[in-house]
Amino acid sequence: MERGEKTSPPELRSQPSSNSVALHGVERGELKTPDIQVALIVCNNPEAGVLKIAAANKIPALIIEKERFFQGDAYIKELKEKGIDFIVLAGFLWKIPVVLIKAFAGHIINIHPTLLPKYGGKGMYGHFVHEAVIKNHEKESGITIHFVDEVYDHGKIIFQATCPVLENDSAIQLAQRIAVLEHQHYPTVIEQLITDIDSL
């Protein structure tokens, strides 16, 4: 990215995620840095509600195919042509290919709805995470924002925030408190990371 250009993070999604709304804090001008924008929504589900959000906000969208994502060029050409230099995952369940990680080294982040390293890995997403937390009688849960590497939910932790797990909590109730943390912290962490990168 050349200095003076807008930093452009795409959002990769596959399942319903409250973070789509949170990320649009960038678009609504709620962040302190005006040069950050959601430049592209990348999705593997053509029926995903986030595509309607993208259309309403006039954000370009790219529907990706599994074979090309894993066995081809992982859409790197399209991302580069769009001027993408930072990738934000929000409910994207596919494992990120090594070729894409290398192409955007240190510029891909994810948010996980619990306190890693607990309750991470393949299959640990959405209500499955919250059910596991409650089943194991944890006293607190939270969110983890981390860099993406070749292993599910394994990259270097950037930020964590906690919330209590209350007696008689359901997975839905816990998820609601987690969503508050996601909306509160994800946009600002994204902003800080991009600002720090641009200042190097």
Model-assigned labels for residue ranges:
Residues M1-L200:
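One-carbon transfer enzymes
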